[in-house]
Regions:
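Short, conserved charged micro-motifs
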Residues: 132-137, 185
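Sequence-specific dsDNA recognition surfaces
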Residues: 7, 11-17, 32-47, 61-93
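Generic, well-ordered alpha-helical scaffold segments in large soluble proteins
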Residues: 34-41, 94-97, 129, 142-146, ...
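A short glycine-rich beta-alpha junction/loop motif
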Residues: 116-124, 158-178
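Amphipathic alpha-helical coiled-coil/heptad-repeat segments
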Residues: 145, 149-150, 154, 168-199
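Non-catalytic DNA-recognition/assembly elements of restriction-modification systems
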Residues: 12-41, 178-189, 196-199
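Short, ligand-facing micro-motifs at secondary-structure edges
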Residues: 63-75, 93-120, 137-141, 148-157, ...
């Protein structure tokens, strides 16, 4: 079967981009169609402090697979240096934009609004249009899958000796398999059961 994408008023064939056929009720969509992707605060080194006052800035080292870690050596910026719309919200998904090869695809989800925290300029915030816990967890696990990590590695550019840069535009064009909401719930609960067994 052939797959098409509507671009403006015309249809473009994308069969070659489709990795596999999907079960009934599932559909393919581009990441850009379900979220906004943006980076965090940019600042000069001398503007950052470790005083624990103001807005906490999380960096790549704060992101572990499926877990956001608050650290003792986190840096802070004064509130006037941080735009309100980049403060972390529940269901945001965070991933390093510039990182080492083995850390490409490392993702963490924000469990509740963090009105005094954002990320630095080398971290992506993936903010979903649909505010739903199961959907954000499904997207988190999907983006962390070997299938998606391979895609992310394929779109990186090497920057410097050991760092890789994930292009926002190319990431936004990723094709994702999306199941119905009831199926998302089943997939997420099954994955979380397996995580419990591994703990």
């Amino acid at each position: 079967s052939k797959y098409y994408e509507q671009v403006g008023k015309s249809d473009k064939e994308i069969t070659e981009e489709i990795a596999f056929d999907l079960p009934n009720g599932w559909y393919w969509c581009r990441l850009k169609d379900i979220c906004s992707i943006f980076t965090g605060a940019t600042f000069k080194k001398e503007e950052a402090t470790i005083t624990r006052k103001g807005i906490r800035i999380l960096r790549g080292g704060n992101i572990s697979p499926f877990e956001l870690k608050i650290k003792d050596d986190d840096i802070f910026l004064t509130k006037d240096k941080v735009k309100e719309d980049i403060l972390l919200k529940e269901n945001d998904i965070l991933t390093p934009a510039v990182t080492s090869l083995e850390n490409i695809g490392k993702m963490a989800r924000v469990d509740s609004d963090m009105s005094d925290t954002t990320v630095g300029g080398f971290v992506f915030i993936i903010r979903l249009h649909l505010i739903n816990r199961w959907f954000s967890k499904y997207i988190l696990y999907l983006l962390s899958s070997p299938f998606m990590i391979d895609f992310m590695k394929s779109i990186t550019n090497k920057s410097g000796q050991a760092f890789y840069n994930i292009g926002k535009e190319r990431l936004s064009m990723a094709l994702l398999p999306i199941p119905p909401l009831t199926e998302q719930y089943r997939i997420v609960t099954q994955i979380e059961k397996l995580f419990e067994q591994l703990r």
